[in-house]
Amino acid sequence: NDFFFLTRRDGQSAVDTIVDLCRRRLPERMGIPADQIQVLSPTRRRSTGTKALNQALQAALNPPLDGKGERRFGDWVFRTGDRVMQVKNNYDVLWREDGGADSGMGMFNGDIGVVRMIDREIVTVDFDGRVVEYTPDMLGELEPAFAVTVHKAQGAEYRAVILAVLDGAPMLLSRSVLYTAITRARELLVMVGDDA
């Protein structure tokens, strides 16, 4: 009960299945909330790359609502409630403890947080109790993280992992990449894609 492979032969059905797993099936059937599920892909591009998956997962898990803060940056709209990743080391950024008096400096490549508030130009992100306010010139340090590449997930672990294994270049589906992806899951791994 800790591993499943769901065969899907095309990108859209794989993406639809991954969205359904995050939104409905794993929370309802396995008791795993969506915020404890991490979707991984070996690639950023293609039909099951992180770009396509992040768009589909944001639409399903965090759709726009009246009054919900949004901030466009490039081709992405950050929204209150989005899961995001710090993608660049920034030793100079100030963080403060959520609800406390502690503060410190530095956010690091791979840190994952949740957008808590968007107020005009400022995007406030909570990284597991460390709160950072991003100004417009800092938004390039953030990427959506509903889905992340296997490479970016190295060193992290998640309660449940959904791994997209469809239409990747052969080198991106190597044994070492698969091993890295599989070992990110603490309790459950679901692979979605082509079993050929």
Segments predicted by a language model, with ranges:
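C-terminal accessory regions
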Residues: 101-102, 109-196
